[in-house]
């Protein structure tokens, strides 16, 4: 069994919808909802929602790259978001819901940039890919009630996933490309 562990950090709008797709993959050790990229130390959900802290809702993934490589994480990430929307994601608007790939080292940056370029050239989207690739910043875990929300609140999670427009967007852009 591999002992390797790395971190990947992705902002993709509401973090509730960003946990389940990664949580279900082999080689994923942990998926944690939280906040990153801002200037406030240990912000609360209420503070982040004001769009004054500079933080984005994000997930930090601990993974074994020998089982589930970073390139596969990137592919899965792109399939959870609208990478052409710079104002938030689906029904959630504002800075805290903008997308971003937070890289932890140079190799991740190279892979993220190559993946973004490949997606831009794929023709899947009519508009340019605007998701930023940023240096990893301090990551602050969200409050416990946000962690693994899809397991704790299944009905509300499903209603939100569909009602926000995310589920339909994913279906229309990726259903025949996976």
Swiss-Prot record:
UniProt entry tagged with the keyword Transcription regulation: no
Gene Ontology MF terms: L-methionine:thioredoxin-disulfide S-oxidoreductase activity; peptide-methionine (S)-S-oxide reductase activity
Catalytic site positions: 14
Origin superkingdom: Bacteria
A Pfam family assignment: PMSR
Chemical reaction(s) catalysed: L-methionyl-[protein] + [thioredoxin]-disulfide + H2O = L-methionyl-(S)-S-oxide-[protein] + [thioredoxin]-dithiol; [thioredoxin]-disulfide + L-methionine + H2O = L-methionine (S)-S-oxide + [thioredoxin]-dithiol
Keywords: Oxidoreductase
EC number of this enzyme: 1.8.4.11
InterPro entries: Met_Sox_Rdtase_MsrA_dom, Met_Sox_Rdtase_MsrA_sf
GO biological process, one term: protein modification process
Function description: Has an important function as a repair enzyme for proteins that have been inactivated by oxidation. Catalyzes the reversible oxidation-reduction of methionine sulfoxide in proteins to methionine.
Family according to the record: Belongs to the MsrA Met sulfoxide reductase family.
PANTHER family: PEPTIDE METHIONINE SULFOXIDE REDUCTASE, PEPTIDE METHIONINE SULFOXIDE REDUCTASE MSRA 2
Entry protein name: Peptide methionine sulfoxide reductase MsrA
Organism: Bacillus pumilus (strain SAFR-032)
Encoding gene per record: msrA
